[in-house]
Amino acid sequence: MIISAASDYRAAAQRILPPFLFHYIDGGAYAEYTLRRNVEDLSQVALRQRVLKNMSDLSLETTLFNEKLSMPVALAPVGLCGMYARRGEVQAAGAADAHGIPFTLSTVSVCPIEEVAPTIKRPMWFQLYVLRDRGFMRNALERAKAAGCSTLVFTVDMPTPGARYRDAHSGMSGPNAAMRRYWQAVTHPQWAWDVGLNGRPHDLGNISAYLGKPTGLEDYIGWLANNFDPSISWKDLEWIRDFWDGPMVIKGILDPEDARDAVRFGADGIVVSNHGGRQLDGVLSSARALPAIADAVKGDIAILADSGIRNGLDVVRMIALGADTVLLGRAYLYALATAGKAGVANLLNLIEKEMKVAMTLTGAKSISEISQDSLVQELDKALPAALAPLAKGNAA
């Protein structure tokens, strides 16, 4: 299969992966309206072409939390990454490290903190949920700090798991799920050999280390259902600060008032995110929410964004809408499932090239020069009425 764009990796991953795994990352909540709008809204943001600007000294480098990044991109936390490629977290972290960008390890990774951290040179980031078991949270923070993790990504938009109907049809959950997963695995030999047999153990590495016993996919599903804490509040940030003195990023912000609260409570950054459309269907896309949030807190806190980013043009669009850096999730997981570390490395190269083309043709020599001036301001005349708020910097 020819890979010429990031979108090609999705088609390749669908061929390689058992359906329960492909649809787990590809799907969203309920009718998947927000999942679709994430991509569609962002793709319709019109860039302003400029020419004859002498772009010979273009640079994608940026700095975030005193870390130099080769481009304003980090790999997002993705649960069960090690089920998509053999020791997937290690491979993805290696690709990010080689490209000079951060890798974020999920709470519910297959590979534990202690397996991933020693394999890379730059400090990785660690993602944490608010859980009923505060002992686990404290243990995870202490282990992340001991392993040299530099930044904590605190996910706050999951006090309860979203309803993902596609999972019941694919075999991730629903009737006879274990039997359906087994049959899917044996009928996808490339995955079965590389990951199913040679990628063991398929534990939830960080949780197994805490519990002192192996954990599997059924444990993952049950643990998610029973451990998320609906009592989460801003006071939990104060508790976390007792155990974490590094940069802390609040992931799951869609409203300007929540962004202001993050500033007031001393967070170092926020991620404008709807969890990739996997939590509450019908909320704003990140592209729609971002301009108003940037108007509210730009300069007071680092603004990251995810959800719907599929290529280098999307990265430039998100930065023009107000983000400082973006997180890639699904896009890199498709590449990882297709070709492991080499796939992620190639994806990052594609994104870098696409960013350079977009910046060259919009006249932005550096990341700091990408702004709303890089967009067509009369979007209400160029785009459907539903996207007009993007031009004005207001949420719909």
UniProtKB/Swiss-Prot annotation:
The keyword Flavoprotein applies. Coiled coil: none annotated. It is a peripheral membrane protein. Its EC number is 1.1.-.-. It catalyses: (S)-lactate + A = pyruvate + AH2. GO terms for cellular component: plasma membrane. The active site is at 275 (proton acceptor). Its main location: membrane. Substrate binds at residues 24, 129, 164, 278. It comes from the Bacteria. Residues 1-380 form the FMN hydroxy acid dehydrogenase domain. GO terms for molecular function: FMN binding; L-lactate dehydrogenase activity. It is an enzyme of class 1 (oxidoreductase). SUPFAM superfamilies: FMN-linked oxidoreductases. Keywords: Cell inner membrane, Cell membrane, Flavoprotein, FMN, Membrane, Oxidoreductase. Pfam families: FMN_dh. FMN binds at residues 106, 127, 155, 251, 306-330. Its cofactor is FMN. It is found in: Cell inner membrane. GO terms for biological process: aerobic respiration; lactate metabolic process. Belongs to the FMN-dependent alpha-hydroxy acid dehydrogenase family. PANTHER family: L-LACTATE DEHYDROGENASE (PTHR10578:SF85), S -2-HYDROXY-ACID OXIDASE-RELATED (PTHR10578). Catalyzes the conversion of L-lactate to pyruvate. Is coupled to the respiratory chain. This is L-lactate dehydrogenase. It comes from Escherichia fergusonii (strain ATCC 35469 / DSM 13698 / CCUG 18766 / IAM 14443 / JCM 21226 / LMG 7866 / NBRC 102419 / NCTC 12128 / CDC 0568-73). The gene is lldD.
